[in-house]
Design a protein with these regions (language model features):
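Short alpha-helical segment of the dimerization/phosphotransfer core of two-component systems
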Residues: 70-75
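Conserved catalytic submotifs in the C-terminal HATPase_c
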Residues: 97, 117, 122-132
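Short helix-loop "hinge" at the ATP-lid/N-box region of the Bergerat-fold HATPase_c
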Residues: 152-153
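Short conserved segment of the HATPase_c
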Residues: 184-196
């Protein structure tokens, strides 16, 4: 095993931890800045070459532009995760306001239901409460849910089913995402939410760098909550996010603009790594 190979393995020694911490804290965020700057120029140029009004009458142009948009969104999503990698281990309380978590969760499910169908999947939302106010950061919880759905879509084969469920009790709100995919190997479960580079380095595409679930952990902990996984190989996976069932007294009067992806569609952005180009077509 070469030194480079060893560095991509799960950390087993102090020098491995320091090495990966340096990459995640310094190199990745700097790389994200340069990528985002270049991507912006590329996207504007592509929009000039294939404007929306022309795509309405040119199926080939529409298909070609959808492939470009898909890959652009994937890179933009990656740069967002790389930017967040620097401070995932730093304690941070997210600013919150009282919102209806049932409404917010159901909205994300409605937005992603048709995208799930493109992958041959069925997405269901289950909640016995019609309304439930609790303190949360709306854009962060949306990002968390989209990341969990992205993982479920990615690993569940066509014909599978994903269920998003909400419940409350004993001072907690439980948000679960359950799939009937292949499950998680036991050796990976221990490190599922760790902020480290993926061990299966030879299989990075299409599974990414493994930063998504650590970001979910950061969001849950930023709300004073926690996240956990249950999985059996061959029988699927359930991810549970527990958020404190409390209120701040600050009601959300209007939706605030979401800054995760600028002016881009946040739902497509959050699921870009699993979607087909068809999701970006106009025709």
């Amino acid at each position: 095993m070469t030194d480079l190979d060893r560095r991509w393995d799960l950390p087993s020694a102090p020098e491995d931890l320091l090495y990966q911490a340096a990459i995640l804290s310094r190199f990745f965020p700097a790389l994200a800045v340069h990528l985002r700057s270049s991507l912006g120029g590329l996207y504007l140029a592509a929009g000039s070459l294939a404007p929306d009004e022309a795509r309405d009458f040119n199926a080939r142009m529409d298909q070609d532009k959808s492939v470009l948009d898909l890959n652009y969104y994937r890179l933009l999503r990656l740069t967002g995760n790389l930017s967040l990698a620097a401070d995932m281990d730093l304690p941070q309380d997210l600013p919150e306001e009282d919102r209806d978590i049932v409404e917010e969760t159901e909205l994300v499910c409605r937005e992603t239901e048709s995208l799930a169908k493109l992958l041959g999947l069925t997405l269901r939302f289950r909640c016995q409460e019609g309304r439930h106010l609790c303190a949360l950061r709306r854009d962060a919880v949306r990002q968390l849910l989209l990341q969990l759905l992205s993982n479920a879509f990615k690993f569940t084969p066509a014909g599978g089913e994903i269920t998003v469920a909400l419940s409350s009790g004993n001072g907690w709100v439980h948000l679960t995402v359950t799939d009937n995919g292949p499950g998680i190997p036991p050796e990976r479960k221990e490190h599922l939410f760790d902020r480290y580079l993926r061990a299966d380095r030879n299989h990075i595409p299409p599974h990414g760098l493994g930063l998504g679930l650590p970001i979910c952990r950061r969001i849950a902990e930023g709300h004073g909550g926690r996240i956990m996984a249950e999985s059996q190989e061959g029988r699927g996976t359930r991810i549970t996010v527990m958020l404190p069932d409390r209120q701040t007294g600050k009601l959300a009067l209007a939706d605030q603009p979401m800054d995760y992806g600028g002016d881009f569609n946040p739902t497509l952005l959050g699921l870009a790594d699993v979607l087909p180009a068809e999701a970006f077509q106009k025709l």
